[in-house]
Amino acid sequence: MRPVSVILFLALIALIYAKTYEEIKEEIKNDVEKEILDDLEEENDELDDNNQEVNDPRARRWRRAFRRLRKIAPLIPTFVRLYPVGKK
């Protein structure tokens, strides 16, 4: 009877160890996934900060002014020629 008890006891310890080993494995896996997600969030925040720098409204004002100037530029010589005509 005694060897059976020892074998059952060792089997119980082995099952307990196996369960905790799986739990530890799962915990390590979750920690690694969490760290990866945190790193991705930080990189995403950095990219968002860069987007704010690119979307500077002052730069857009200059671009808009150049676009308007390109549309009006061909008409400037006509305005210059017609300006003295109206002063007579």
UniProtKB/Swiss-Prot annotation:
Tissue/organ expression: Expressed in entodermal epithelium along the body column.
Propeptide residues according to the Swiss-Prot or TrEMBL record: 19-59
Localization: Secreted; Target cell membrane
Tree of life domain: Eukaryota
Entry GO terms, CC: extracellular region
Modification type Valine amide: residues: 85
Signal peptide range: 1-18
Keywords assigned by UniProt, alphabetized: Amidation, Antibiotic, Antimicrobial, Immunity, Innate immunity, Membrane, Secreted, Signal, Target cell membrane, Target membrane
Similarity comment: Belongs to the arminin family.
Function: Antimicrobial peptide with a broad-spectrum antimicrobial activity. Keeps its antibacterial activity under a wide range of salt concentrations that mimic physiological conditions of human blood, which is surprising, since Hydra is an obligate freshwater animal with nearly no salt tolerance. Does not affect red blood cells.
Official protein name in the record: Arminin 17593
Organism: Hydra vulgaris (Hydra)
Species classification: Eukaryota, Metazoa, Cnidaria, Hydrozoa, Hydroidolina
